[in-house]
Amino acid sequence: MDKIAIINLKGGVGKSVTACNLAAELAAKSQAVLVVDLDKQGNTSKFFGTLDYDRPSVAEVMLGENTAEEALVCETGTTAVHLLPCDMRMLKANRTILMDNGPRQYYLRDALEVVDDNYNYCLMDCPPDLDMGSINALCAADWVIIPVDCDEWACDGMREILDQIEQVQMYYTPRLKIMGALLTKYRRTKYAAGVTAELLKMPGVPLLQTVIRYTVRVSEAKSAHMPLRVFMPDCSAAADYKALAAEGDSI
């Protein structure tokens, strides 16, 4: 199972939208996909209509109170896409893990071992901060995708992310690689050109060839709880996420 952490310290850059739509596109290529929601806001879980406090979440899985198999949501509305949901219970998990005097970074990696052979891909939707969910995702991952929206503050927090990735590569997970920065909400503006130029100057951060073009259809599809390939398959962003799946599959 190839594990991809989708991370940025900024909110609203398209992490959850990317996780959901990339999962749907990979599934359309006959790949079995596990989506792990690690953000306490639960946007990815809400997208798949699975936010339910009466069932186990990824928080209980990381703490060993339930297995990943017990917490899996298989009825996501998207064939071959399963979900480990997240909600505010992640706050408790973060506090508990922080108080552990032993290795804190492998809770998620170890919890996912039981389902490792069941999927081709695992997409981990990280919160917009470097909490224990994000750290555990990076230490479990093979690859990192960094969504970057095209506004004037787009690269805020990039240095902190890159420093953390470097620490993980050095001490915990040497195989971890940056797949690339993914431009989202892309329009041909001076801000987009400036963001592109700034990213190209950053050492060790490849820029993915695919960009996700801006369209209101993204918000509409999110409100409808449907991936773009189902909601509006002929829109520009649907084509872009299809291209992203092909690009990621080829790396």
Give a label for each model feature.
Residues M1-I251:
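P-loop NTP-binding core
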